[in-house]
Amino acid sequence: MIEQNKHQQLRIGLASPEQICAWSEKILPNGEIVGQVTKPYTLHYETNKPERDGSFCERIFGPIKSRVCACGNSPGIGNEKIDSKFCTQCGVEFVDSRIRRYQMGYIKLACPVVHVWYLKRLPSYIANLLAKTRKELEGPVYCDLFLARPIAKKPTLLRSRGTFNYEIQSWKDIIPHYLSARPHYLFARGSGTFKEREIATGGDAIGEQLTGLDLQMIIDRSHMEWKNLVELKWNRLEENQESTVDRWEDEKIRRRKDFLVGRIKLAKHFLRTNIEPKWMVLCLLPVLPPEPRPIVQLGEGGLITSSDLNELYRRVINRNNTLTNLLARSGSESFVICQKKLIQEAVDALLDNGICGQPMRDSHDRPYKSFSDVIEGKEGRFRENLLGKRVDYSGRSVIVVGPFLSLYQCGLPSEIAIELFQAFVIRSLIGRHIAPNLRAAKSMIRDKGPIVWEVLQEVMQGHPVLLNRAPTLHKLGIQAFQPILVEGRAIRLHPSVCGGFNADFDGDQMAVHVPLSLEARAEARLLMFSETNLLSPAIGDPISIPTQDMLLGLYISTVENSQGIYGNRYHPYHSEKKSFSCKKPSFYSYDDVLRAYRQKRIDLYSPLWLRWGELDLRIITSVNQEAPIEVQYESLGTFHEIHEHYRIRKGRMGEILNIYIRTTVGRTRFNREMEEAIQGFACFEHPKKSLPALRI
């Protein structure tokens, strides 16, 4: 059983036969070792009790009822009780029935079996280590081809290495006739010695090749070959050969380099984790505890349903027992080879049904659900039962756009915020002596008085929250934000951060989590804030960019009459085409423009003259000064030069008195926002310098 206080991580990997025995075997108080499943039976058809040494045996996996043995006795009942921990009649220990959730068993295979995950899956680790293709390995694995292995300094029949077709009928007559003329072969069972010493097939053939691997030598040789390929590639580049043949050769070199890199990584992983490659060939097959593969009766006397894993285990045990009997009786070689192939197929179906072609099916033509089907997918053990569980201090709601938010802020509904931060609010209320005890603080929170919202806002100021949108495919799928209380029930989000979440505002939901510890809050503040994650982790391009809605809004707010100063006396964007004075209003500052807009004296697209604070025209005109369109003289001798985009007022001597630029309310507002943003960034970068006002 996994105890929370002792285990802090879970690693999935290959297990050695010794480790499988340690998981499965246990020593009873009488010294008997149990753990091996030898019978294909599950429950007795009359008593519905587990069969002895079967896949539900109580001696192996523990009692069905806590502290009650298979005989029905308990430690306090019965005169034949010798030990309070053990029943001498049935051999069942008096322990808690929860042991059946984690106590495993094992099947001792009569022949080694290759683990199909490491053979058929991509990439094929066995094929990678042995530097062969999967098709070359499938022949020996499924007993279609045989591996010749001449032994040095010993009498041998075969002089070849590698795989070959072993025809049973042709060799059955040749080998005994050959051995009868050579009495030094007759110390054993004739052709049996030849087959055991010089021919291998099935899991034996693959296991022997994996056992003889030197991982460090594989790394060194692969690295040397990779360097040679790199030098060959550079030589081709220097020769500037671009023919079709050379392109094919370059592609072959690239594929070979990728293969070598993968092989080096795999060998280094085996060395780093102290895993032996031969463990990819199974000699002992673990049997899952009974709880993950239950047998359930539907009602009293009703139909009994069983997990598909039980049927797949039954097939493995039946075929394994058949092969054991054949080997014990020295059965026909063709039968033995055929049975080895059947065991390999049965184990393949148990681990991953259908990976080798047509899956095994039940009487209703439904494919059996294998171990891979149980653990993979959205409804598998990991995602359904282990991941995605409900956690404390978390919530979930629909996201909507928050145009008033900064990039690092998110709008948190008050209903969600008061639940997430309730513990912090209670502590603050009691610490400030606003509430005398816990009950009074909870009562104040239920009443939702004004003081509660004030305390909540103070608590949220220094406490970031994490927003997560499933599926979390990269690190930007979960980011930290500073929460802001908002009305309603939807989480408000800045539109520019949607790129990292791959989210939009068409009904997407997000989960919100509250980091509790000081370390988690510091990590969220320093590493996970949205304003510090502006670049894509995959390609490095900006990922927090203006959305299409923002760009369209900016375009609409800053659009002006295409005719400019030459427009007619009717405003082109006015809905009723009302006439207005040709004399455009003049304003001294941004505030005057926005004040007039709020008072509805002008609209968003009204052309106006705004006084320009700088007398340097280089930032609004070209190098060559354009001629004025119109010159207006005043009675005191001053005059106005009207240009297309600006107006200059000059004195009698030609000196510049002031400058007005032609713009609109929308452009004025946009320019002010940009100026404040740049000014704030400049002050943040150079806090000790007084920067002049920026004009855009």
UniProtKB/Swiss-Prot annotation:
Note on how the cofactor is bound: Binds 1 Mg(2+) ion per subunit. Binds 1 Zn(2+) ion per subunit.
Transit peptide is among the record's keywords: no
Record: residues binding Zn(2+): 69, 71, 87, 90
Function (record text): DNA-dependent RNA polymerase catalyzes the transcription of DNA into RNA using the four ribonucleoside triphosphates as substrates.
Complexes and interactors: In plastids the minimal PEP RNA polymerase catalytic core is composed of four subunits: alpha, beta, beta', and beta''. When a (nuclear-encoded) sigma factor is associated with the core the holoenzyme is formed, which can initiate transcription.
The organism's taxonomic lineage, starting at the top: Eukaryota, Viridiplantae, Streptophyta, Embryophyta, Tracheophyta
Protein name stated in the entry: DNA-directed RNA polymerase subunit beta'
One term of GO molecular function: magnesium ion binding
GO biological process, one term: DNA-templated transcription
Superkingdom assignment: Eukaryota
Catalytic activity: RNA(n) + a ribonucleoside 5'-triphosphate = RNA(n+1) + diphosphate
Signal peptide limits: none
Keyword set, alphabetical order: Chloroplast, DNA-directed RNA polymerase, Magnesium, Metal-binding, Nucleotidyltransferase, Plastid, Transcription, Transferase, Zinc
Enzyme Commission number(s): 2.7.7.6
Annotated SUPFAM superfamilies: beta and beta-prime subunits of DNA dependent RNA-polymerase
Enzyme class: transferase
Residues annotated as binding Mg(2+): 504, 506, 508
GO cellular component: chloroplast; DNA-directed RNA polymerase complex; mitochondrion
